[in-house]
């Protein structure tokens, strides 16, 4: 526009006697983005690296899963390959792919985080009048910690990462968002994804977070699939 005005001539443009403007206010999207930036800055300050994985994933990852049954996958009608034939239900496998990619290149001490949408299909909610009634999209944050917490330091002995370290990161996120852990309920979680795990819920029963040690069957599955 500036180049056009230069050619046309600023003096040839009539300026009205009144100027019109509209006031804008911050909406829900702006507030959500602000919170995301706040959490991202905190995690980066703790040594995390942000990752961004494809929302398309391999449906085979969900075979036999109880937490995320394959029947609830949003399947693609014409997938390019079996590696990208469904929409992800969880951020878990994308993070494991990133870990496997780095571990295969001798980089095993990792701390990752990712913000992303997950997708869910419920056949019971199908409605001929509402084509999208059976589909749900939710925004999630995933954290992955693996390898050594401290390595090759002259001031500190090598120390392996642990679930307690991850628990501290999760609690610090809640504190940064103004949530008092005393008002939340932390309890044991039985889940086929984790060998041992905890969940964080409100007193009303709404689950806010789950974290734990991923079972060997899923970590081995990811490594095997990556090699092939």
Task: Describe each model-derived feature in a short phrase.
Residues 2-222:
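Extended beta-strand-rich architecture
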Residues 223-228:
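A short, hydrophobic C-terminal helix/tail in secreted or cell-surface proteins
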């Amino acid at each position: 526009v500036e180049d056009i005005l230069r050619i046309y001539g600023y003096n040839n443009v009539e300026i009205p006697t009144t100027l019109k403007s509209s006031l804008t206010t911050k909406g829900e999207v702006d507030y959500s983005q602000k919170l995301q930036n706040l959490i991202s800055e905190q995690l980066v300050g703790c040594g995390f690296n942000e990752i961004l994985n494809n929302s398309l994933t391999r449906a085979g990852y969900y075979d036999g899963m109880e937490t995320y049954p394959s029947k609830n996958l949003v399947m693609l009608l014409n997938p390019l390959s079996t590696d990208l034939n469904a929409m992800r239900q969880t951020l878990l496998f994308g993070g494991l792919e990133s870990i496997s990619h780095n571990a295969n290149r001798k980089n095993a001490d990792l701390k990752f985080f990712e913000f992303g949408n997950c997708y869910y299909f419920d056949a019971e909610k199908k409605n001929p009048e509402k084509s999208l009634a059976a589909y749900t999209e939710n925004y999630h944050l995933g954290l992955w910690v693996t390898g050594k917490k401290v390595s090759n330091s002259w001031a500190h002995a090598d120390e392996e990462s642990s679930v307690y370290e991850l628990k501290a990161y999760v609690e610090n996120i809640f504190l940064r968002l103004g949530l008092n852990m005393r008002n939340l309920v932390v309890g044991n979680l039985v889940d086929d994804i984790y060998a041992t795990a905890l969940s964080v819920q409100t007193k009303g029963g709404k689950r806010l977070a789950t974290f734990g040690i991923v079972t060997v069957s899923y970590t081995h599955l990811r490594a095997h699939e990556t090699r092939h």
